[in-house]
Curated annotation (Swiss-Prot):
Protein's UniProt keywords contain Transport: no
GO molecular function: rRNA binding; structural constituent of ribosome
Keyword list, A-Z: Ribonucleoprotein, Ribosomal protein, RNA-binding, rRNA-binding
Function description: This protein binds to 23S rRNA in the presence of protein L20.
InterPro entries: bL21-like (IPR028909), bL21-like_sf (IPR036164), Ribosomal_bL21 (IPR001787), Ribosomal_bL21_CS (IPR018258)
Organism: Shouchella clausii (strain KSM-K16)
A Pfam entry, by short name: Ribosomal_L21p
Gene: rplU
Protein name (database record): Large ribosomal subunit protein bL21
GO cellular component: cytoplasm; ribonucleoprotein complex; ribosome
UniProt similarity note: Belongs to the bacterial ribosomal protein bL21 family.
Subunit structure: Part of the 50S ribosomal subunit. Contacts protein L20.
GO biological process assignments: translation
Keyword set includes rRNA-binding: yes
Length: 102
């Protein structure tokens, strides 16, 4: 059984026992989290939401928080001596999917 959930403005296909990386969640490591925005549940009988499947949820456990690799943002305007260099590291949360209800 699998499901498609929406979190952090992104849609992610998940299965039970899978480890996923999502935008930073406001939960401590070891805490249970529930994703209620379930768009699709697949298995023997598929359920498609309009836009969400009623009564469906996906639960998981927060394993850790972290930050992705640094990306460099560089702006430059030719012939004007304008240069700006800035780094960015996006925070993430690693979640282990436990149960798909739906």
């Amino acid at each position: 059984m699998y499901a498609i959930i929406e979190t952090g403005g992104k849609q992610i296909k998940v299965e039970e026992g899978q480890e996923i990386y999502v935008e930073k969640l406001d939960a401590e490591a070891g805490e249970e989290v529930s994703f209620d925005k379930v768009l699709f549940v697949g298995g023997e009988s598929a359920k498609v939401g309009a836009p969400f499947v009623e009564g469906a949820s996906v639960t998981g456990t927060v394993e850790k928080h972290g930050r992705n690799k640094k990306i460099i943002v560089y702006k430059m305007k030719a012939k004007k001596n304008y240069r700006r260099k800035q780094g960015h590291r996006q925070p993430y949360t690693k979640v282990v999917i436990g149960k798909i209800n739906g």
